[in-house]
């Protein structure tokens, strides 16, 4: 059987000389892995993580790992390797997809979101965009957080916390007596302001980390590569603050 699709290479593991197992996040079929061979200098450039490729997967049976062939559509790596924030953000989002999506599980809408994020990241690193990506990933996995109104009073004013149980915003008035049991809600997520303080960045990363760890990673740790990104962003801002 054959599968043709467009996708982003998210993993590449050596199998033997010039042969690798690649994993591609495809637009219409989710994650697919296959054996790919680098037969020339050109193909070595094609099979890089983050490359957008025309993907052909061939196997006798669907359950087989199959043979993968790719043609390059777009490469981002040149934009990322010259900037640590871009590179670490890129590595983090790829590692999260690799960990959370299951092989051959369809995620139709998320592919275009990933491409849009990578296009924007190639131009400029934006922390707000990164957090929005993590929030979208949580929503894709069934854990959409709601910042639109207080989950108790329905007010849209003075939202200050997030309930760790419901994933819904809580107003300052309602939440103040229970603030030790609630998550602080970063103001930039409500205002859209890209002038984000170090404390707001810490709050935002703690917020998404909480839901990743509680509902998705459970007893195993989040990807180490994401932690590298988190530490870099917070340490970099602490030094320049």
From Swiss-Prot:
Top-level taxonomy: Bacteria, Pseudomonadati, Pseudomonadota, Alphaproteobacteria, Rickettsiales
Gene this protein is translated from: recO
Summary of the function given for this chain in its UniProt record: Involved in DNA repair and RecF pathway recombination.
GO CC annotation terms, alphabetical: bacterial nucleoid
Protein name per its UniProtKB record: DNA repair protein RecO
Native source species: Rickettsia bellii (strain OSU 85-389)
PANTHER family for this protein: DNA REPAIR PROTEIN RECO
GO biological process: DNA recombination; double-strand break repair
Pfam family, one: RecO_C
Keyword terms: DNA damage, DNA recombination, DNA repair
Signal peptide range: none
InterPro entries: ARFGAP/RecO, DNA_rep/recomb_RecO_N, NA-bd_OB-fold, RecO, RecO_C
Family designation: Belongs to the RecO family.
